[in-house]
């Protein structure tokens, strides 16, 4: 299986992304919104990437960005952020949910608030990555406890 092998059994872009992700201080995931959900190809890629890669993702900063004509942004934003939070990754925030609006190519460029949200996100994510790097140098990473697995059916 992918988990046992330490990489995805389907040898494609996921296995190319994993070492880049491992070296990175942060990860930005962006998706259009379809039926209040992220692009299915992206979700499949993220499922495979996060499941098959065994490196420690703790304190890598994550940020999600979504784009929609009108609705479904908050559900999609939440869906993408779950990859970060289950992996111990701090989530960079902005002044609002990280969404921008537009239906046709070029329309999102007219969303002034959305563009401001993206600029704020970029500054906040950069600050957070620099702060974590400085904290690692001065204090190290927080101590990790051994995981205690729990099944809901006993």
Q: What kind of region is each of these model predictions?
A:
Residues 1-7, 104-107:
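N-terminal beta-loop-helix "entrance" segment that forms/cooperates
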Residues 90-154:
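Glycine-rich phosphate/pyrophosphate-binding loop and the adjoining helix
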